[in-house]
Amino acid sequence: MAKKESYEEMLTKLQDILSNLETDDLNLEESMKSYEEGVKLVNKIYKILDSYEAKISIIKDDKELEFSEDYGDK
């Protein structure tokens, strides 16, 4: 089973792809493959960030509820 790439690994890979695309050393076919791989990585990265954003929102809402129960109007 393949190891799941971390956010940091994907971000580094995306930065490498962007650097390669900016050098103009790739032919058209290589550029398209790199571009497609980059788009896939961006989508994976956004999914990870969306997941963490949802978790933060839940934690924040729980803490606000806890705070209002502890210190709210009685």
Swiss-Prot record:
GO molecular function: exodeoxyribonuclease VII activity
Cellular localization per UniProt: Cytoplasm
Keywords, comma-separated and alphabetical: Cytoplasm, Exonuclease, Hydrolase, Nuclease
A Gene Ontology cellular-component term: cytosol
EC number(s) per entry: 3.1.11.6
GO BP of this protein: DNA catabolic process
Pfam family, one: Exonuc_VII_S
Superkingdom per UniProt: Bacteria
Keyword Nuclease appears in the UniProt entry: yes
Keyword Transferase listed: no
Coiled coil location: none
Principal localisation: cytoplasm
Gene3D superfamilies: Exonuclease VII, small subunit
Enzymatic reactions: Exonucleolytic cleavage in either 5'- to 3'- or 3'- to 5'-direction to yield nucleoside 5'-phosphates
Family listed: Belongs to the XseB family.
Function: Bidirectionally degrades single-stranded DNA into large acid-insoluble oligonucleotides, which are then degraded further into small acid-soluble oligonucleotides.
HAMAP family in alphabetical order: Exonuc_7_S
Assembly with partners or alone: Heterooligomer composed of large and small subunits.
Protein name as annotated: Exodeoxyribonuclease 7 small subunit
Organismal lineage: Bacteria, Bacillati, Bacillota, Clostridia, Eubacteriales
Record gene name: xseB
